[in-house]
Amino acid sequence: MPQSRSSASTWFIFALLVVTCSYSAGQTRAWLTHSHDAQHTGVSSVASQPLSKIHWKQRVDFAVPSGEIFIHYGSPLVTARNTVIVPVKAGSDSFRIVAHNGTTGAILWRQSTGYQAPFAAFLPGMGPTLFGRKLFIPDNGGRVIVRQDPDLSSGVVSELYFYGQKNFQSDPLAYKQTVQINTPLTADTHGNLYFGFLANGSTPIGLQSGLARIAANGTGTWASAAFLSGDPFITEISMSCAPALSPDGKILYVAVSSGDFGYGYLLALNSTNLSVINRVRLTDPASAFDATMSDESSASPTVGPDGDVYYGVLENPFPFHNDRGWLLHFNRDLSQQKIPGSFGWDDTASIVDASLVPSYRGTSAYLLMTKYNNYAGISSDDGHNRVAILDPNASENDPVMPSTQVMQEVITQLGVTPDPGFPTFPGAVREWCINTAAVDPFTKSVIVNSEDGKLYRWDLTSNTLSEVIKLSGGIGEAYTPTVIGSDGTVFAINDAVLDAIGR
């Protein structure tokens, strides 16, 4: 929902395999983290099943508010052996993990956690991650729960502390009351963990809100957001911004901000010691003012197979770009700003091999899939909500501000369900409800969720919505992810329920 409420192809496929390759042969079918992998490509390594039938369901919220749902639910994960890891909001601000057999939906185990979501108008979700035979889960006090063997009904559980176990044990209450993880967890190919945290008060060792790294051997380090940005007014790692890694794992990307509706930077850091490689202050490509950073966004950096980095922000002045924001675009070390996309609000772009779109006649090896809503009732927008495939290396006039050059539209798809909330806007349709979309290169399609309560397959070969299944009656809600499991089951969240869909 809007804030106001060829050889080139061969190279691409090789590079994408490098990006999404697993840490062992057994990981190749897994959905490991937010947007699939540490580059947030959203590209499945398994062909999705047809959207024919709902196999099973799991509530992801046992304290659903009345009316619209201003909550970001954490992405489900799927192991290579088809265990589905579901973050569940158990109360008004309490969470747990529920693990299911991916085929039958049978519950295998539950894991409690003391994690509490940081305050934001759109409540942030809890974002676990998988590495090897370990599941990492956010806990309170900035701690991370480690559960061994998540495919088994029981597993050894331990804790990690980025600031040291002895420090925690010296004053547990001080850390539990003040330190909160505020992003999904990201693991690299060696099992090192990265995440943002808030320090909302004093601790014995003087923690300040920033970025944590826990090495595979359990040792931790951290750096404050103010220090990393070189700006004393920067107060946090951007809310819900999952850190991303370059294809070779050497560079870590994360955004920082001065708080809700403030300004911010995108950082490129040495992934081993968190030293700054580069930082860039994020600006609106039309006005050249500071871009608006919103705590209600779940946008995270996407890293392309060529190393280019994409990150979504809101416009400034707001909402002069019709609450669409911008998808900012940089080279690997952030030294060059490239063509922006015309939509960036609460969206993590997915990577699409150019060969999946037969109508494409350009030269880019890969394209981007993004939300492309056109919110009715906001500035000059008309309610013609779309999703889009964009060429990151070709430009055209922006559809809202023609004087600004943006990524060229390759194909777009208009929503299908009329929006009764906007009867005075001809052709207005319900929003696409997606913050990270699963791309299926085997069926050449993208799995997209809508606020009309339906899940769609967008066929990129014909530019049609070739399959649809009803999940709910439709509701306005904070944007949600889609996922493809290790047996091809499709997962989507609609009206606070996770549905498992397949043949």
Describe the residue ranges of each PLM region.
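Bacterial N-terminal signal peptides that target proteins for export
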Residues: 1-12
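Bacterial N-terminal signal peptides
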Residues: 11-22
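Basic/polar N-terminal segments that are highly enriched at the extreme N-terminus
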Residues: 2, 23-27
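Extracytoplasmic/lumenal domain signature
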Residues: 27-34, 41-71, 80-86, 90-123, ...
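Alpha-helical solenoid scaffolds in large eukaryotic transport, assembly, and signaling factors
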Residues: 74-75
